[in-house]
Amino acid sequence: MSLNQKITKAVALWPKDELRPWLSFPKTLDTSIRARLQKMPPQQANKQLNALNNLLDNVYWNKYIPKQVVLKPQFKPSYYESLTQIRRKEEKAPLWKRLFKRK
């Protein structure tokens, strides 16, 4: 498999950000990683791609498990879940409500 195919495969598997769907991290990642890996020697580029695939496979998450203090802040333990719920609720709202919502 060529370097470009490996990059395309890894970027396609990258999850979308539920809280900021208007930002396309995979697209940004694709652009920046292609430019950088093209300039590297093949052996170093493969190491970088392996690191990217390890991120996708949660290798580092499982190796360095984050503490609950990070995942559930003391000031509001359900902070991240409530953000996700609010975002989903906004997506389901009719278009006119989303357009004229007061901020």
Curated annotation (Swiss-Prot):
What is the predominant subcellular site recorded for this chain? Answer: mitochondrion
Is Mitochondrion a UniProt keyword of this protein? yes
- The parts of the chain that form a coiled coil are none
Which Gene Ontology molecular-function terms are recorded?
ribosome binding
Protein name, UniProt field: Cytochrome B pre-mRNA-processing protein 6
Quote the gene name from the UniProt entry: cbp6
Question: What is the annotated role of this protein in its UniProt record?
Answer: Involved in processing of the 5' terminus and the intervening sequences of cytochrome b pre-mRNA.
| UniProt KW keywords | Mitochondrion, mRNA processing
Q: Which organism is it from?
A: Schizosaccharomyces pombe (strain 972 / ATCC 24843)
- Which BP terms from GO are recorded? mitochondrial respiratory chain complex III assembly; mRNA processing
Localized where? Mitochondrion
Q: Which GO terms describe its cellular component?
A: Cbp3p-Cbp6 complex; mitochondrial matrix; mitochondrion
